[in-house]
């Protein structure tokens, strides 16, 4: 399912690295990363990964201890533009904040307005541009 989603044009545009599936599947047991399939009414439609900010995210600058990062995509094209992205992101983050996570960060590409709008609807604010191993990104934050 995830492999099929990664091949969808609307996903491949942003998750185009041919090693993405290998990267995602190789991290299944990583203690700092949790991966989820998001469903609505029993229908899987999105992928979400949440990770502890660590040494590989130094480009994000100093962050409060316990800060988590988030990556996601909607795999099913017919679910785009319907508010599902911001809704499941907000619900997921609210649960983490209830468990004591102080801040969430996300780093969309600056030329991905659909993602940026969804993250703003989910409560994220623009914090500035950062350079990442994947290229320039817009750091966005949401505090508990």
PLM regions: where:
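Conserved acetyl-CoA-binding loop of GNAT-fold acetyltransferases
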Residues: 120-129
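Conserved GNAT acetyl-CoA-binding A-motif
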Residues: 96-108
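Conserved beta-strand-loop-alpha-helix junction that forms the acyl-donor binding cleft
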Residues: 106-116, 132-136, 142-144
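A short, well-structured alpha-helix characteristic of acyl/acetyltransferase catalytic modules
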Residues: 1-25
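Active-site beta-strand termini and strand-to-loop segments that position acidic
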Residues: 39-41, 141-144
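Conserved beta-strand segments that form the floor/walls of ligand-binding pockets within enzyme
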Residues: 69-74, 105-107, 139
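Conserved acetyl-CoA-binding loop-helix of GNAT-fold acetyltransferases
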Residues: 75, 81-98, 117-121
